[in-house]
């Protein structure tokens, strides 16, 4: 499974993004200024949006895993990849995700 950054047509991942944040308005807001990463096999498995919050802080705004892949370590793998991405550039990786029922069960 590969993780790659998506720079165009980010809204095509909206169904997965809505698993991590039920408010499409909020998704639009941070998707515009953030970076979208997708884990994909044959189809998208997980998405993650990160934003530069300044002062050396990278924040995970949205993290969602397709329900067919829950409890398989996918979310952890995405977080690990974001930590690797942040290393050497940011001093803090913080998680600022919504409180949808699916998100809360992950935490």
Question: What feature does the model see in each segment?
Answer:
Residues 1-26:
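Short amphipathic alpha-helix that is part of the acyltransferase structural core
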Residues 27-31:
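Short loop/turn motifs at secondary-structure junctions and domain boundaries
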Residues 38, 43-52, 56-64, 94:
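Conserved beta-strand in the GNAT
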Residues 63-70, 98:
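A short, internal acetyl-CoA/4′-phosphopantetheine-binding micro-motif in the GNAT/acyltransferase core
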Residues 69, 73-81:
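Conserved acetyl-CoA pyrophosphate-binding loop and the N-cap/start of the following alpha-helix
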Residues 86-99:
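Conserved GNAT acetyl-CoA-binding A-motif
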Residues 106-107:
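Conserved active-site tyrosine of GNAT-family acetyltransferases
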């Amino acid at each position: 499974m590969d993780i790659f950054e998506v720079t165009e047509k980010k809204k095509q991942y909206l169904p997965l993004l809505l698993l991590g944040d039920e408010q499409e308005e909020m998704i639009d807001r941070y998707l515009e200024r953030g970076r979208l990463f997708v884990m994909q096999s044959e189809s998208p498995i997980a998405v993650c949006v990160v934003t530069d919050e300044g002062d050396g802080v990278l924040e995970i705004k949205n993290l969602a895993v397709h329900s067919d892949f829950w409890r398989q370590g996918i979310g952890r793998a995405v977080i690990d990849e974001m930590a690797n991405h942040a290393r050497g550039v940011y001093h803090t990786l913080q998680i600022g995700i919504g409180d949808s029922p699916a998100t809360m069960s992950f935490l």
